[in-house]
Amino acid sequence: ALYSDDVDVILTATRNGLSNDSTNPADWNGEANATKKDGPQVTYYRSLIYATPSAYGQELAAKVNAGEKLTWEDLDKATWAVQKTSSSAGYIYPSMWLMANYDGKKISDLSNVMPIDSGYGTAFSYAAAESVDIIVCYADGRNDYEASWTLPTDQQDETGKQGMGRSDSIWNEMNVIGVTEGIYNDTVAISKESQYYTPEIVAALQECFINIIGTDEGKA
């Protein structure tokens, strides 16, 4: 998306999609809308902007679930937890979502941002502790922390994630307030400025990589 005018994506990997792909954040919220990993094969995934169970996070969620559009002032008042600036789902695409919806403003324009170097698990633990009002994560990160969300803090789920001590479901407490554009999976791309950028070269590269994928070495 950042360089769509300069490069042509000629192949992209696919992944198992989710049961939900709505761009309306309210459609992701509540136990009845719990996301399942049973969607069709897709070439992209999304990043979601989540309001946490903090008092202010609940205010933001209530507005979105009532069909209201959040203002920049609403978002700027919140404390955000974001990933490294190189993270597609944890920084880049949420920043692009802000740019598209709030007159070009970015994460770096927000007043209260907490950078996290230790991954999404830390973001969810901050959310559970109500230390922040908004976190950003791939769709749907709640699947991966559903079990640990309601475990006592001295226990771990079967994957080793530490319990976060909440009493209500993560689907009820972590509400989506923003949905980004799709983020490509791994791609093969060619520069439109290259002297080799021709339909023939594009077709040859596509055939070449598809053939490689069909070999045992390519699947390794």
Predicted regions and their residues:
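Pocket-flanking alpha-helical
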Residues: 1-28, 122, 142-148
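Extracellular/periplasmic catalytic domains that process cell-envelope and extracellular macromolecules
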Residues: 2-5, 19-20, 40-44, 73-75, ...
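Solvent-exposed coil/turn segments that connect beta secondary-structure elements
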Residues: 5-7, 14-16, 52-56, 85, ...
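A conserved helix-loop-strand patch within extracytoplasmic ligand-binding domains
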Residues: 24-89, 96-99
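Pocket-lining segment of extracytoplasmic ligand-binding domains
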Residues: 64, 68, 76-198
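Short amphipathic alpha-helical coupling segments at ligand-binding clamshell hinges
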Residues: 196-208
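Periplasmic-binding protein-like
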Residues: 208-220
